[in-house]
């Protein structure tokens, strides 16, 4: 779908401090998430990136500052409505499963919304098909591979037709092939659905998939821009403890001039 350049989410001067902690986890964080685009929020462990996801959906409440959703500032009372529009896929999908088999798990959110049975069956079948898991609709989620489990988690989110999908380290437990397959699926979802993707990750290879990158370091926005801009600053990425994508490491070893390069681009160059 053609990208809409308006912003679906905005954080303005947001601070956050966990109860009992002396230090703030987030300090004066401000950024915008463009609608219908893929924004990657990257940083090492402890940079505050996952806390941002919790603030967006109201799992935690900002200590100071404003969070805006669809042009409207949100209060503590609004988060139930926000959760109607935002779906999250976590690092370990096991923690999200509630159904005994795949199709029941995908149906869970729809049941909570009192969707009529026949309509529910239609939505569940389509959502499972969208993630390529039709053959596993009657399987137990816990019997699936890591990549398959994440596909089921995504199907459960898609069934509710969210405006935003947040992937919170969703690929960190997957092998390289499963990770690549899941990223292809997310690209397909972005291309065919009216949805904004927010990927929270320490994996810069995953961040290459996005349209926009926000770099977090020690609870602040360190830098942001498109992937080409961010990944040209190799020194900055290394200084804050982020591991360069494999394609860029090889590019460096071979002495090529361009710093930003995808795996496909490196193959073409070789």
Curated annotation (Swiss-Prot):
CDD domains: ABC_cobalt_CbiO_domain1. Residues 9-243 form the ABC transporter domain. It is a peripheral membrane protein. It comes from the Bacteria. ATP binds at residues 43-50. GO terms for cellular component: ATP-binding cassette (ABC) transporter complex. It is found in: Cell membrane. Its EC number is 7.-.-.-. GO terms for molecular function: ATP binding; ATP hydrolysis activity; ATPase-coupled transmembrane transporter activity. It is an enzyme of class 7 (translocase). PROSITE patterns: ABC_TRANSPORTER_1, ABC_TRANSPORTER_2, CBIO. Its main location: membrane. InterPro entries: AAA+_ATPase (IPR003593), ABC_transporter-like_ATP-bd (IPR003439), ABC_transporter-like_CS (IPR017871), ABC_transpr_CbiO/EcfA_su (IPR015856), ECF_ABC_transporter_ATP-bd (IPR050095), EcfA_1 (IPR030947), P-loop_NTPase (IPR027417). Keywords: ATP-binding, Cell membrane, Membrane, Nucleotide-binding, Translocase, Transport. Forms a stable energy-coupling factor (ECF) transporter complex composed of 2 membrane-embedded substrate-binding proteins (S component), 2 ATP-binding proteins (A component) and 2 transmembrane proteins (T component). Belongs to the ABC transporter superfamily. Energy-coupling factor EcfA family. PANTHER family: ENERGY-COUPLING FACTOR TRANSPORTER ATP-BINDING PROTEIN ECFA1, HEAVY METAL TRANSPORTER. ATP-binding (A) component of a common energy-coupling factor (ECF) ABC-transporter complex. Unlike classic ABC transporters this ECF transporter provides the energy necessary to transport a number of different substrates. NCBIfam families: ECF_ATPase_1 (TIGR04520), PRK13648.1 (NF010167). This is Energy-coupling factor transporter ATP-binding protein EcfA1. It comes from Staphylococcus haemolyticus (strain JCSC1435). The lineage of its organism: Bacteria, Bacillati, Bacillota, Bacilli, Bacillales. The gene is ecfA1.
